[in-house]
Amino acid sequence: MSERGLLIVFSGPSGVGKGTVRQEIFSTPDHKFEYSVSMTTRPQRPGEVDGVDYFFRTREEFEELIKTGQMLEYAEYVGNYYGTPLTYVNETLDKGIDVFLEIEVQGALQVKSKVPDGVFVFLTPPDLDELEDRLVGRGTDSQEVIAQRIERAKEEIALMREYDYAVVNDEVALAAERVKRIIETEHFRVERVIGRYDKMIKITKNPFKAK
């Protein structure tokens, strides 16, 4: 049986560059990842494929999954639910494939309560001035909204202590490389690999124990 895959939970403040860094990570073929497919109750749009773009479900089906604890994390936005189905993630991990989940901080904390052995990586800006410059550079938000995002970022950065690793996004390629090294290292943690040797070793007594 192959080693179970890792659940990599990747999050950070709005504007920190999560999507850009994730795309850089996925652009190289040196590691196989599965990007987690989200579930939603919003209507399926032309060209979208169930199980590829989203898992499309009715509101009743989604709420039943919430009730029975089958959602890793979820939120309601503009009248529709969005979230990460637990079954899909577990089935993929059981195949030995790493699952990469890019979500907001509150969602990441929901996931940690259900999958504590996941790898939780927090992407942080070099400083708040840099983060503000990036938000302004987007050209999509008013100054009021940007100020709100900065305040939210402060709150989220304070939650960094809940994560396993913090990666500074000072340069996209470097940040992506740091994340990949973290994942590679996690695959060699003793508690993750000892299971594969269970059939190879049978310890009946401690050879170093004094007689």
From Swiss-Prot:
What is the source species?
Answer: Streptococcus pyogenes serotype M3 (strain ATCC BAA-595 / MGAS315)
- Quick one: a GO cellular component term? cytosol
UniProt keywords (A-Z) are:
ATP-binding, Cytoplasm, Kinase, Nucleotide-binding, Transferase
Annotated ATP binding sites? 12-19
User: What's the chief localization of this chain?
Assistant: cytoplasm
Tell me which family the UniProt entry assigns to this protein.
Belongs to the guanylate kinase family.
Which InterPro entries does the UniProt record give?
GK/Ca_channel_bsu (IPR008145), Guanylate_kin-like_dom (IPR008144), Guanylate_kinase (IPR017665), Guanylate_kinase_CS (IPR020590), P-loop_NTPase (IPR027417)
Q: What name goes with this protein?
A: Guanylate kinase
